Amino acid sequence: AEAQRGGIVETIGDASYSFRLRNREIERFEDKHRGIFDLWDGFFGRGTKPTSTEVRDIIALGLVGGGMKDHEADKAVSKCGPDDLMRLFHISQAIVGVAFMPDAGDEDAKKKTAEADLID
């Protein structure tokens, strides 16, 4: 699978999934938990760390934004155990990060190409 702009593709268990947060998923998260910017700060130790529930909800909402139905996303996340939480934490951090900065990876690739051209 290829990631949409503002999304990522990651593997959970033995399946590859597309994740993307759109405004509607962000608003759903904020209605249930806290502001997305508070969550963002928490990922980097500048605020309250995300709870396991928040991490799982970002994963599920990212799956919905990536094209999955709500019940399918909930089922995929429910298969994850406590041993998956650190990986889910990092995936949820990436989901939010790429939603905020959808072209960041493209800029890094362009910069590397430009630097390589200068060396040649």
Put a short name on every predicted segment.
Residues 62:
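Conserved active-site "lid/cap" helical segment
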Residues 21-26:
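A short, sequence-level motif marking secondary-structure junctions
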Residues 1-16, 27, 31-49, 53, ...:
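Charged interaction scaffolds used for protein-protein
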